[in-house]
Structures are given as C-alpha cells and as structure tokens.
Amino acid sequence: MSVYRDNMYMKYDRNFENRVARRNGQARNASLAKTLHDSGIAERARSPSGSAIPHAYRVMNGSGANDTSLPLTSNPAYVALTSRISSSKSENNQQLAANETAGAPEGTEETVDISNSISDDHANAKNLPAASVKALVGAGVLSDELSVIAYDMSFEDELIQDKQLIDHSVFDQLLEMDDDDEHEFSKSIVWNYFEQAETTIADLQKALEAKDLKKLSSLGHFLKGSSAVLGLTKMRKVCERIQNYGSLRSRDGVMKLPSEEIALDLISKSLSVVNDFYKDARAYLLDFYEKNSST
C-alpha cells in the first residue's frame, strides 16, 4: 500500500509540475508578446505578405538589433524595451496580458497571437498573422538575452498602474498604536523612515557608482522591508526589484539576468523610480499628519 501511495504521489507531483511549467511558459509568452507590442517591436515585425518571421528578422537585423558587436545595452531592441521603465502608462496592458494567457487548453503548445496587440490603424487581419514570441526568438528576431529583458519589462505596467501609494490596511494598524490625536508614536516611526530612506537612497547611488551588486541587493532588501512596515506599496515593489536585480535575477526573481552590465543598467533606471515614489510617499504622509493633527 505504501509503495502504491508513493507512486501516486510521484505521479501527482509530476503532473502538477508539468501544469505549472506549462502555465509559466504561457505567461512568459504572453508577457513577451505584450512587451514587444508596447516597445513597437511587434509593429515592426508585421509583414504585409503575412510572413511575419523572415520579415521581422530582416527589419530588426537591418536596425542593428542582432549586431553582436554592440553592447547589449546599446542594442536598439534593448533600448526600446527598457524605455518602458516608468514611462509606459497604457491602461489596457494588464487586461491584454490576462487575455493572452487565458483559456489555453492543457497539453497544447501555446502560440501567442500578437495581432490583437497592434493598433487599430493596422487592424487588417490578412496582414496580421499569429506569431509566437518563441518563434520570434527562435528565428533570431530577439536573442535569448533580449527575451529575458522583454519578460522583465512586461511587469512595468503593474507597478505604474497601481494607484495604491499606501496600503491603509497596514498603515492604519500603526495609527492604532497612537495614544493621542497628535499621533506622536506613528509620527516618530514615519519620521525615522524618512531619515532611513534618504540615507539608503544615497547609499544606493554610491553602490551603483561602485558597481557593487551585492550591496545594491542588500540595500534594496532593507528599504523594501522598512517601506512594507508603513504599507508603502510602490516603494516596496520597486525596492524588491532592485534587490532582485542585484542578485542577477529578473524583478520577480524567476529568471537569471544575462550579465552584471544589464543588472546595473536596470538598477540605474529603477533608482529614478525610487526617488519619484519616495517623494510621492513623503508628500502624502506629511500632508496626512498635517491634516490629522489636533494642533
């Protein structure tokens, strides 16, 4: 009975792992398709003849996207993809990703149709063949390295579109510890956070200049934790991103980044986002205490 049960568990585990791997693959393809569209690469890959892959290869190759003599950070496709950091504000990107990943029959190979991602100006179905990002990567339109960058950038809208600067379910727990209407206790915690955050952001800049990835990861982890205590949602997310980049991982920690050069470049771009989110959080909290103080 024990052997039978163990075999059943092993079979279940394998089936579960296969389903998870399939879902992850589908999500990655959808993320890549969305990101390619948002960066304009999918648009350039469109072929009037209906033959997307060779056409895309010629176009991207002609633009220098596959020029291996170029540093990856100077690659036109890389520049197009990473320009989305803190700049892409399309309202329908999250829904697009959800639509792309939904409803794939189990056991089938996922092919992501990017035709629905193209602007209405080009919505001629005959000219918009379904094309999987896997095929684009396989054909040399995007290198494996660039596919990792595209995967990572596909999370950008989640951070930008999140309107929740502060999670009040967390912050209000801190306020409940105040003994008076002056909020002296919570205010001391918040003011201490301001000092810590400003010092840490300055240290992050120094670590970036020194190209110290280990230090960058550690500082990102520290600021993520202190931001989480106050319920500063956006600060927590962007600091977690820096923590993972410093460990040579994608922002969600799933994929390995191609090089230290890429990690440092992504951290550099993310630091400007940290500064913006910190200023927003600081202004919000100062205003909150000004309005909610009895004096």
Swiss-Prot record:
One GO location term (cellular component): nucleus
Protein's recorded name: Multistep phosphorelay regulator 1
Skewed-composition ranges (Low complexity): 97-106
Residue list for modification Phosphohistidine: H221
A single GO BP: phosphorelay signal transduction system
Region listing for Disordered, in residue ranges: 89-110
SUPFAM superfamilies linked: Histidine-containing phosphotransfer domain, HPT domain (SSF47226)
Keyword Phosphoprotein: yes
Free-text function comment from the UniProt entry: Binds to the msc4 response regulator which is part of a multistep phosphorelay system that transmits oxidative stress signals to the spc1 MAPK cascade.
Keyword vocabulary terms for this entry: Phosphoprotein
Species for this entry: Schizosaccharomyces pombe (strain 972 / ATCC 24843)
Residues covered by the HPt domain: 182-284
SMART domains: HPT (SM00073)
GO molecular function: histidine phosphotransfer kinase activity; protein histidine kinase binding
Pfam family, one: Hpt
